[in-house]
Amino acid sequence: MNKRSLFHFSSRLHGIVLATLSLLTACSFFSGPKTASVSQIKVVAEINANQSSATQLDVVFVYDATAAALLPKTGPEWFDKKAALLAGAADSIDVASLQVPPATIADVRLPGRHSKATGVYVFANYLSPSGQAVSNITPYKSVTIWLTPSGITYKFP
């Protein structure tokens, strides 16, 4: 192979590599929003959880940014506005609802399209203010929600 042929071969190979990289970049750019990793959620309620009361718990799966922006910042606010939010969100939100008594272990039944969710949030109607904040569990694959006497903790095994 002479120098000129080698130069053309090298230029052509360089062009092919650049075109391939451009296509790969475009595919990842146009693939849409990143989806949630959540595939398993377990709830463990300790004996005296939520002042020995059953805990109303909603795991909210959101499918677009507009619906995510409408979510309240606390559990009590979520439960107060839940009906209106669901009516206005149409197909943008799925909810897995549980009523968890103390001394209980429960698996959360995930909605059929959970793998397409762009966000997953936990709302609890806890008596103590320390258990009322919304929790974003979107990036975690496996989540255990611990309901304790004083609040809620999350474990990501």
What are the language-model segments listed below?
Residues I41-P76:
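Early exported N-terminus immediately downstream of N-terminal targeting peptides
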Residues A65-T66, G112-A117:
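A short, structured loop/turn motif at beta-sheet edges
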Residues T25-A26:
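C-terminal motif of bacterial Sec signal peptides marking the signal peptidase cleavage site
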Residues A117-L127:
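A short, solvent-exposed beta-strand micro-motif common in secreted/extracellular proteins
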Residues G32, L127-P157:
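Glycine-rich, aromatic-bearing surface loops/beta-hairpins
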Residues K73-R113:
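Tryptophan-paired
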Residues A36-V38, A54-Q56, S115-A117, Y140-S142:
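Extracytoplasmic
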Residues N2-V17:
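Bacterial N-terminal signal peptides that target proteins for export
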